[in-house]
């Protein structure tokens, strides 16, 4: 397969059908809505036929939905964090269903009632939290004054005044000494800490100003005592009130936990509101008149019939006008999105292409060409039966036992497929978690290893370079093929066939001199390489207005041969990573084997599991990254440009469920 062929779909219908149309299109996940008001040559007809369309204020409705979504998320988090721990939180189990089913099973009245109940509990909880905080602060303050055995308010009179406050501990002794000079004043130290000393003093009203002057000099901070009883009495009351608050919180936590069943309902509703937000966000892209709406978008031509069938199910044929058009050259150049469609085995590898750059609409999709090489390279770098089996079983069981988000589905399938070459290369290298396979079983001789990572290093190195050479030749072939498709035959020779000729010529020379000892191969290879080099030198001369510039350009192009040497060297990492991963695993096995029997079968078991898991993670990561690098630099660089715009259909967020346009 390749880049999917797109068609421009136009929908015209009565304005009253807007919501049902948008919901149906969204459930299909197959139509990208065009912005008909974007300034573009492709939209010039809009101003001609719809000079004064109705303008839609989507922000107001989006704000309402955002407010509701915030309330839902707040309610879910509140139940999760404050509900009784013993009560199981019932989350929505991911499954596949249609958008129509999602909307039909929603009740605004039931949702509002449940949300109001939870938000009321939240309000009560927050009130208790505030009261508890106040009581805890009060308790901490009273603890510092609990040795004060009288109530300051009760002691105040016309003749005397009782004041409490704090002084920095460094100034406490000096403060006490100076206050002692006032005969009619009484100062008592109530409490102390390493930094602060707590005082209470009684002074005659006549000496109040003098006392305040001394207190000010020593940084005395006056405290307000707001209670009627003594600190000790008030402390007992605060502790009692605090315990009552804790009891109320415990009861309220149980009530919150009883709402755990609401979580799945709230998640269901959140999915609906997220879908509605997506629909609302594109309403300013479509044309509204007092009576009609006009929607235009891009649809995969293979899903065109699905769209037609869907519209026939929701509206009578006379209620909707539907047309499909091929994109114009201008639309192809500026607007048409790219959607990849490949065989189910190849499709997971599309994410590697997407990470690099999507192809332009009329460009070749490199995924099917890249996939076989990535399989071989990844398997060669992992090359362990045990790691491959774990990958396969893990990915397979994950897909069978759990409904995964679509992105994770593709990722799991990706590693399930990659497990196969990892196992195959594991047999070739005879490696099972770093241990060698037995030479025979039940008297039957086994041919493993086919290649030994200790004795056949040079063979593996040569094989790595050969695989790289094959991939480079394929890349050059694709480059030539793409030029031929555009009828650029000279460029096909210059950028593809000529370089293939040079590389094949060098191969023939090496075969003739080093392996076959046949001069015919040497002469044939030399002739092919020279002829190809001449093509690379001469073609720019004919393409350039200046012959000198053409020769210089040709010479520079031919100098690019040195880059191919670097490319081939890059493929030696296939050998290096494959050998290193197996060697590290074998070293871990040897480390545990050297342990005494008691330790080997206790701590050793845990140790080998941890070490093998670490090595497996690093091996898979290295194979993933270096495999991708070989595709991006050495392979894509020969023929692929990229720069396409991703196909973004009107669809649901799928935060909690997978939406399938087929009714379940």
Curated annotation (Swiss-Prot):
Membrane topology: Multi-pass membrane protein
BP GO annotations: sodium ion transport; vacuolar acidification
Family annotation (InterPro entries): V-ATPase_116kDa_su
Entry GO CC: plasma membrane; proton-transporting V-type ATPase, V0 domain; vacuolar proton-transporting V-type ATPase complex
Transmembrane segments: 373-393, 460-480, 496-516, 522-542, 574-594, 601-621
Subcellular location: Cell membrane
Keywords tagged on the record: Cell membrane, Ion transport, Membrane, Sodium, Sodium transport, Transmembrane, Transmembrane helix, Transport
Any one GO MF annotation of this record: ATPase binding
Annotated PANTHER family: V-TYPE PROTON ATPASE SUBUNIT A, VACUOLAR PROTON ATPASES
Family: Belongs to the V-ATPase 116 kDa subunit family.
Reported function: Involved in ATP-driven sodium extrusion.
Name of this chain's protein: V-type sodium ATPase subunit I
